């Protein structure tokens, strides 16, 4: 039996759709019944995952029913809508985007949670990603942090869970979300708990840096959705505190960052324990070669959706100010800047190293500024406290490294200051994207030195494309310096022309 009354109120309504089941249906393993695999579907995917389904119980994963409003959209209207919202799609049998939450076909209890959250319309990634995910197909989503991607996979995950048999004693989760950092995992779990509460879906968050006891108890009680960092999840599996035999919906969030942080072996080990006909959703902000290669191992005939241009661009709502200064001028420049802008608003200051974060924070505090730092050497309790102080405004200045800040969803950051210029232009765009979210205005200040000169030309292009002023010093530096070679600090490919065709 299914867990819940579906849209029709019939608890078995989804169970009749055998052609869309994960096992025992068509060879497309969850694609719509009209789709047939072809060589073109597998271009660039020389070894799609091998399916040994002996002894595996069938499961449902295609729940999408196109609404009349969506069905009525002409091809021209679909093309115009995608162009307006900067949606690029690849794959076979691609569903049309949805313009409203009701068009997705979510059950009423999900729609109630969406309404309570105050959302008015789907974001671009939700508009196209929801019907793709609800069809049960594998999905590659390339979208920035803050784009609404978390709900793009969580709401279909809730529908997926409620269509499966109830957990039995000793069962592991049905949905597994892998995330690179503790902070991101906690944020995902908070959203999963909020939107899954009305259907009594149990969730837990598994990450290192804290005692295992409470996490072990959650797993042993049985939870439908687990959000985890790779290392701690493997610990739990090896100590027999959980298993992945029931996982039929797998999410890899921020896959590019997980690979950057060296999690490739752990990810491969985890996925090897999950049934091969699962549905896999693979999310990344960028599309470098190593991310593409991993996707080919884990995904079969996926949809692909890219939000935004194939080149990273800065948000036009963000005012960008780049000052060319010397290294020795940085701290005095920072203090002068804080004196000018400090109004109680949240200010996020980026530095390259943990040591630099601590040094600048210590100096600021000695000078009377309410600053705290966050980086990977701090305990989980310290990190939680720093974030709480920053979010509440008690300490409105926070210094951070890129890794520590990645995935943090702190609302109302008014200013970003790049004390140290990052190691790539992609990271520059990520950093300044911490402000100017959800239609708000923001300002990003950047200290740029001669040591950063190799980025001057491409940085100038970013500023000009976003309609920003370029200082004569930066423009001059850009004209006299060659840009970094590919793979050494420039933009990474965002995947619009490679891989799945």
From Swiss-Prot:
Residue span, Helicase ATP-binding domain: 130-305
Residue ranges with Basic and acidic residues bias: 1-20, 38-53, 491-501
UniProt keyword RNA-binding present: yes
Residue stretches spanning the membrane: none
Motif (Q motif): 99-127
PANTHER family assigned to the protein according to its UniProt record, in alphabetical order: ATP-DEPENDENT RNA HELICASE DBP3
Name this protein carries in UniProt: DEAD-box ATP-dependent RNA helicase 20
Annotated source species: Arabidopsis thaliana (Mouse-ear cress)
